[in-house]
């Protein structure tokens, strides 16, 4: 997801060269401050392979004039569209028997308060109450820690096939 934030920031002229991790995403979130997102058409697609595409959203951003008010509005619209896209994707991939299972939100994009708060609100309306990391940051380090924990649990439960794959 993070690269979508980087691309959006570049398309809006907020950060063309990133020297530090998350600079582009932070500028995008800052640009949206104080703006209410517009009601827009669906600007994402869930592809036949189950992946999420934000290309329609990127096309809209590419057409945004680079004046400060338009960039600020487009930034707010981006955050809203991403939250709605993720919610739609999660709800489509979650079957009725899985709605009560824990859903963990992990990755650096969940440091973005605007998008994360909106996503949690949308999922809550659907009866899904996701888990967010509080003991460790949700970025790459936290994701790696979670992966290591799951691998240790799978090994302990005998779900590893002796190699590096989890047995069904």
Model-derived regions, located:
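C-terminal region/appendage detector
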Residues: 81, 85, 110-113, 139, ...
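Glycine- and other small-residue-rich loops at beta-strand/loop junctions that grip anionic moieties
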Residues: 75, 79, 108, 134
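Short, glycine-/Ser/Thr-/acidic-enriched flexible segments
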Residues: 4-6, 13, 110-111, 135-137, ...
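Hydrophobic, well-ordered secondary-structure elements that form the walls
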Residues: 86, 105-108, 119, 145
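Conserved phosphate-binding/catalytic loops in two-lobed NTP-binding clefts
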Residues: 102-103, 113, 119-143
